[in-house]
Swiss-Prot record:
Protein name: Tachykinin-like peptide-XI
Source species: Phoneutria nigriventer
Family: Belongs to the tachykinin family.
GO cellular component: extracellular region
Modified residues (Pyrrolidone carboxylic acid): Q1
Tissue-wise expression: Expressed by the venom gland.
Length: 13
């Protein structure tokens, strides 16, 4: 999970 923050950000979209 290197882009965990990006995953959460895109998850909201």
């Amino acid at each position: 999970q290197k882009n965990d923050k990006k995953d959460r950000f895109y998850g909201l979209m």
